[in-house]
Amino acid sequence: MTKRNRNNPSRKSKNSRKSAIRIIKDNENLTPREIARRKRAKRERERIYQRRRLALSVLGILIIIIPSFLIYKKLNTYGKEGYPAFRDEVLDDLSKTAFVSSTEGRSLTSAEKNADFDTLYETIVKNFAVDKSNIESFEKFTQKSDEYRKKITSSKTDQDFFILLGEYLAIINDSYTKILDKESYTDLFEYYKNKKESSMNEILGNPQVVNRYKRIINDKNVIESSVGIEKGYVLRITLPNFKVNEIEKMIDEVIKSVTSAPGISTMIIDLSDNNSLNNLFVNEFAKYFIHQDYNKEDLIFYRGNLIENTLKDMKADENSPYQTAFIKNTSSNYKEKIEHFNLDSYMYYDPVALKIIKDTTFASRNIYILTNSNTANEAIKLASIFKDSSNAYVVKNALDPNPTAADRIYEFPPSLFVLDHSGLIISLNTARSEKPNRYMDYNQRINSKYPISSMLSIIG
């Protein structure tokens, strides 16, 4: 057996290196150069450790912040409530004035406000029914856009934003063009909730819209409609607002009243402060009290596509009092001379007819209608229907002897569109009749603190 060479130089070399390493490590008599090198190495290691600790700290903070932000956003973003399961919530706290309650920390961002403002501006510019009577107001509306965009960007609360929108819409000086109030929204929603084929169903049932309008609270007491007998011989119907879903109840009250006083031959319809946009009520209510069937035909010109959903719904609904073929005739092909608006501003036109068939429930009675300076829109339309079909005597309780924008008789219902972020619905005048604008021709003007008493004196 061969013995290992204990004097193997290779082995000796390895042992020498290990020994040398131990000696160097344990040797405290280091050279200044070696000491400086070790200090530099130590500082470098400390810097590396500090960077690692900083990176881990930042990562830990992000791990905490990101999930917390997502949870916060989930809890505070507008919820996607289903339709129509939310309808009971929508009907809480009816209001006529759009006053917005606290959103508990979830307000609209500046970007959302600006996006809604841009939608409002662009939709109105493309679709508003411009004519010679409103061209100056329309141009002022467009010129003020930058000014109001800056105001809206700097607005602090949602309520400030909505007030600014209302101010901006008022520049156009058109009573049809405004933010839809909660009172009207609630009534329209109740009517259209089961009409799923209607475009109004989609607008009113938009989750963002429902979420917004359920948070609108009462700003003032809402005056309810009422029926009564004045001086034992005059039927009085007070309509401060229009609610199509309450017509059946109102007609029952009228039946009770006229049954208790069978000699009634005169009625007062009080439309004071009524500026409703609800044409559904007008057409349904009028049929009970007109003396004969009402028919009115018009050619309706329109500039954009917003009105098309309304025309489609009218054409598809066999029971609608409005009738139209909706064939989108090109305005440039219209050969008749138009003097009161610029035909080049309009894209299409369609014939539209309004036909209201008299209901024979009630006998014909003398009709007196009371309005004031706040009466507008569909209330004025109702007064015009009674005046044209039943020779109604229309009285305005106001000082101004001249016609105002509120006295205009609109020939076609307004179109509605949604501001996606805020969930507000905007009503817009989108139709222009071929004929000159009509304004209510009042039989008499009064200035009375007690207008019903004044009406009774007029009746005699």
Model feature map: region roles:
Residues 316-324, 414-425:
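A polyampholytic, Gly/Pro-enriched intrinsically disordered region
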Residues 207-224, 324-365:
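Alpha-helix-centered segments that form part of catalytic cores
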Residues 164, 281-285, 337-340, 346-349, ...:
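Long, folded non-catalytic interaction modules
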